[in-house]
Amino acid sequence: PSSGTTTYISPSYEVKKATETIKVDGVEMVFQLTPDTESPAEMNTYIPKYKALWMAENCSGTMHNLYTLRGAEVRDGNAWAQYIMEAKELFGDKTEVVFQAHNWPHWGNDVINDYMANTASVYKYIFSQTLMYINQGYTSTEIANMIELPDELNKIWYTRQYYGTLKHNVKAVYQKYMGWYDENPIHLDELEPTEYSKKLVEYLGDTDKVLEMAKKDFDKGEYQWVAQITNTLVYADPENKDARYLCADALEQLGYQAESGAWRNAYLTGAYELRNGTKNYPNSEGSGATALGMSTETMLDYLGICLDEKKLEDQNLVINLEVTDKNAKYLLRINHGVLIYSQEKWSDKADATIKTKSAGILGIAQNNQKLMDAGIEKVEGNSDIIKTCLLYTSDAADE
């Protein structure tokens, strides 16, 4: 089936006030900004005509993620809770249906107010209890194994851990306020996993004996421990099939036990890859139309990401850049291979001056000749400077 064309149109209007009322196609909507909740930019929307409250992903019929396993900035559980309560204060007494990006709507004013209060309580509890234990000197993993939701909150279906989990959300709060370092100096500059595993196996000695013991622990249901010790054996020797298969069996059991769909998928995917290997999927090409919606500064940051700065470390270049469709000028420097830029006055001693539309910048970043042809209007000075950049474009350019 066709999935259509993915593209992006920049917003024609931006909500900037804490609450703002706008008519959209004749329908009055009240927008409530909720930044740094489920995402850095988020908002709830109340529709008075229907007494309907859209909660985006701030209330989602399940425990959500303060940290998402796919990778993203850690979310602020305290702000999340407070914005839900603000929505309750603003709209709670006049709402008859609440709906959101995932899961089912909720009807009835009393039900809705309980739903919002209980959801806010979950995120507030995770935030406050984690900080309490941080102040007592416990580490991230210790706290994740200490905290349990209050029994009454744990019994509510829409706060269950079907997506986010208490354990990884606790670790998210720890990460936000304390970072990765747990004050144990042996963790400052740890050996990478393969080197560590090889040394540990050297100390353990007979790996067959280790596997024999691990199988006994597997039979006792100690799946997490079995996964951890066999993971060490696999890192030390990826060709050790007995270790791979036992690790896969342990991960599979952990997946079967997981209430969270995200955890279950992670466990079962890990088990599959241990048994069958991993595939070399091609890099995603992304949507040029979507990328063209980026600001010029974001596009230049993207260009810096796409350049292999290690290979460029001997290069020192100065480029005057005019972005004609944004009516903006920048001074770019490749300083010891690092791309830095500012909107300061152009240099009289620049290696090159490039006049281009935004598409040209994106074309260089993605090594896309079609976009370069469409965007780059003029290059003065060192005409090979773009070729130099393209020569050192990394694999990230294809993503």
Protein language model annotation of sequence segments:
Residues Y392-D398:
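Conserved small/polar residues in nucleotide/adenosyl-binding loops
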Residues P1-G4, E89-V97, W104-S295:
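Accessory terminal helices/loops
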Residues D25, P48-Y50, T324-K326, N335, ...:
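Short strand-coil-strand connectors
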